Curated annotation (Swiss-Prot):
CDD domains: Ribosomal_L10. The keyword Ligase does not apply. Keywords: Ribonucleoprotein, Ribosomal protein, RNA-binding, rRNA-binding. Pfam families: Ribosomal_L10. Forms part of the ribosomal stalk, playing a central role in the interaction of the ribosome with GTP-bound translation factors. GO terms for molecular function: large ribosomal subunit rRNA binding. Part of the ribosomal stalk of the 50S ribosomal subunit. The N-terminus interacts with L11 and the large rRNA to form the base of the stalk. The C-terminus forms an elongated spine to which L12 dimers bind in a sequential fashion forming a multimeric L10(L12)X complex. This is Large ribosomal subunit protein uL10. GO terms for cellular component: ribonucleoprotein complex; ribosome. NCBIfam families: PRK00099.1-1. GO terms for biological process: translation. The keyword Coiled coil does not apply.
Amino acid sequence: MNRQEKAQIIEQLKEKAERASIAIVTDFKGLGVEEFTQLRANLRNVGVDCQVVKNTLARLAFTGTDHEVLADKFKENCAIVIGYDDPVAAAKAVADFAKESKTFDMRFASLEGKYLDEDGVKALSKLPSKEELLGKALGTMNAVPTNFVSLLANVPRGFLNVLTALKDQKEAA
């Protein structure tokens, strides 16, 4: 690989790191080609990139980005998983694959510039997704006016029931 190719890889990875909300560093030693292809497909389905890069190139690419906390931690063979929109979806996809595979491990991550160890990534993977949280918030916000309108409707309804009962009572008499 010549200097120009290395510079291009660094530039591409730096651009991805600048857009990323999460970067997870994984150990893929012992992972077969089929398994790694399956991992990439799983990650692609949730809008996440996975890239294997030399440690020195990764160090240079992550320096000067929000995920700079990872720059000095690249050692041994590693694959970098980069998530853009939903960090929980990226963490879930990686954690699920790590459960299935005996040779694939999460090492550490950077979530919007904050360092997370392996336990932190696992904890993040157990949180509800962005869509689920938005749905719960919307449901909660919608419940307040609905309950208020129902409460307001009960007053005239109760009054109408009393009038109907009085009418029935007078008709019976």
